[in-house]
Amino acid sequence: MNHNTNEEKTEHPTEHRIRKFRKKGKTRYSRELSSLFILLVGFINLWWYRDLIVLNFSKIMSDSFLFESNDFLNNNNNLLKILMSLKEILFSFFPFLISLLIVIIIPPILFSGISLNFRSLTLNFSKLNPFHGFKRLFSFQIIVEFFKIILKLFIVSIISFWYLQFSFSEILFLVNANYVSSLSHGYNIIFSCCFLVILGLFPIVFFDIAWQQFNYYKKLKMTRQEMRDELKEKEGNPNIKMRIRQAMKAVMRRRMIINTPKADVIITNPIHYSVALKYDEKNMNAPKVIAKGIGEAAIKIQNLALKHNISIISVPSLARSLYRYSEIGQYIPGPLYKAVAEVLAWVWKVRKWKKEGGIFPEKPINISVPSELTFTGEHETND
């Protein structure tokens, strides 16, 4: 089928298309929002653990500036001091790192759900094509991403420069203060600067959320041709469905040809319906339908019955009900036992007549079918 690649995407996406996008790992999740969460958690940790961090760094500096004569003679002491300092640094930042690890994992799950996508790990040679890469380089998506990076650099630089200039006198004070005061004041300066930078990044995050939402639904939108293709995919190609029906009918014909010669009697409409019944007193609990058909198939069943000398009886109401309420290979419904028993009694009389001769048994008349199983019939035709 030829698809018009220039066809405009005007149709709203279906649930099926949204699920396909999610399977491919395509979601509307904003990376800028994730980055903001990481910065916020880092900022909260800087505030929450400020006393612990300042205390541990003060201790590290205090230990670093104390010298003993043994330290110069024993290298192991120096190594031990370095290791202890590293331990203090890790201890200070351990809660900070754990919380960052959690916030890196949780937001994507909250906003996009758990989606394991291994397709991105497969080798795609089209991505190695320099021509395609060059086209992507100048796509609108890349231009927007580049604009966001430049804007972030600009905002962070402007805010940091302005705040450092504003706090210049405090920064100079750190030079003359003792190391504990320097650490505490320096920590507060960094903390305040981070707070202002995070506030400055909020507009970019809001823009990115809106952009990702717009871009996601733009990609999800479908052309009319895609809608038709999806409908075919869901409901099945009509040509394939027709071939399946033809194959099923062919199987039914073969079963009919095999099973009909085994029947005890054929109950007919007589033109529109034919039902072949088999009953073995020793091995069956009730009569069983072994073949049935309407239209042309019904005529074929009757012809096969004549060829194999099987009794045929015309009971239209019973034939219709058996066809409607019985399946091939299954026992007949209980309410039809009495009507079928009358037919089978006539069949056995016919068999006795064939062996012994005499007067041909009279066919049963006025065979009644229960009202709940009465079926007027739909005169279809089978190919």
Swiss-Prot record:
SUPFAM superfamilies: EscU C-terminal domain-like (SSF160544). The keyword Protein transport applies. GO terms for cellular component: plasma membrane. It is found in: Cell membrane. It is a multi-pass membrane protein. The chain crosses the membrane at residues 35-55, 89-109, 142-162, 189-209. It comes from the Bacteria. Required for formation of the rod structure in the basal body of the flagellar apparatus. Together with FliI and FliH, may constitute the export apparatus of flagellin. Belongs to the type III secretion exporter family. This is Flagellar biosynthetic protein FlhB.
